[in-house]
Amino acid sequence: MLAKLKSLGPGLLYAGAAIGVSHLVQSTRAGAEYGYMLILAIILAHVFKYPFFALGPKYASESGESLVAGYARLGKGTILLLGFITLSTMFTVQAAVTIVTAGLVQKMTGWSFSAPWISAFLLVLCFLILRIGKFNVLDNLMKVIMIILSISTVLAFLFSFQVDKVVVENSMQVFNLKSEKDMSFLLAFVGWMPAPMDIAIWHSIWTISSPSKKSSLFDFRIGFYGTALLGICFLALGANTLYGTGVELQSSAVGFASQLVDIFTVSLGSWSYWLIMIAAFTTMFSTTLTCYDALPRVMAGIGLEVKSTKVSNTKLWRIVLGIGALLILFFFVSNMREMVNFATIVSFLTAPILALLSYRLVLLRNEELKLWSIWQKNLALVGIVLLFLFSIRYLMLIL
């Protein structure tokens, strides 16, 4: 068992990318605004996304290639579609996770620099870490980060049931599927719960890069079930400390960071301030780092398939991603809530397309590689239908 835990790598990178905005921001917000009403959304999101997320490490370990190479087997049009989807979402995804991290840095250090400038510093730091250490640094950092976060979150969750909050009359919202506001939040919540659909592609790339691919599914399950548990814990923290109090979570990065830390310290006590501050920062920095590692690799992989060349341009895409994310933060959206909502909703709307591509790939190679069982294929099909139906429902509300 200890040997398996020591070998954990891509599964923790998955967890590092997943436990970030979706948990610290969206799950906490779901609990604060709707109480326990959206806990079912966390469970269903994990259930219906499971076959697609498991496909990443499974396909990589069985075929020896990433999902990018797998999608290329479906035709050039498919790989170009993947390139378009990735290019249309990557800048907002990176901008969203980086500005949340910047808010935590502002809270932790008291720096007077604006969130976009701190974001620039963070992305340069990520670039240097990945340039110097590559996969090993990411792998080793994640083991420490996930242990700190998991222990502190579970403890805060348990103690939050003892919090004596003041409930304000008529301040308890009830979720309504006919409400554009509530539907927008649901899609934003599910879009990144536990992570965007693209993470299966990232996971397949990390699995290929990992020294050992044999424990990839054990590795994945540890990360997957861990993110489900922590998602529920963060929702409960929001519900137990803020729901019904009339206190609204702030939209600015530093304002939200302050409230997030307060939620933990109210549950655990003032002694936990720096423990939580460090855990929250390391969690969000891990998300920023893993996204900054994965997205350029995906684009570079797409380039290799389209051009049929062996020369990777990951470093170039990393620079492009950093510049694009910073342009958004400096000149378009610096409000954390708007940035997160936009990125997560776009991820939800592209999810059914990515899910359909994965389903087609399984149909092509399942007999050869045994990628999905019958129940997983059926579950995936139901998931695709639900993703399309919710996307259509949302578009009908806003158009």
Regions found by a protein language model. Name each.
Residues I147-K178, L186-S204, A355-E367, F390-L399:
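Hydrophobic alpha-helical segments and their helix-loop junctions in multi-pass secondary transporters
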Residues L130-S160, T344-A351, Q376-G383:
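Membrane-interface loop-to-helix entry segments
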Residues E62, T78-G110, S119, M284-I302, ...:
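Hydrophobic transmembrane alpha-helices that form the core helical bundles
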Residues G83, M108-I132, I147-L158, S308-I328, ...:
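Transmembrane alpha-helical segments of multi-pass small-molecule transport proteins
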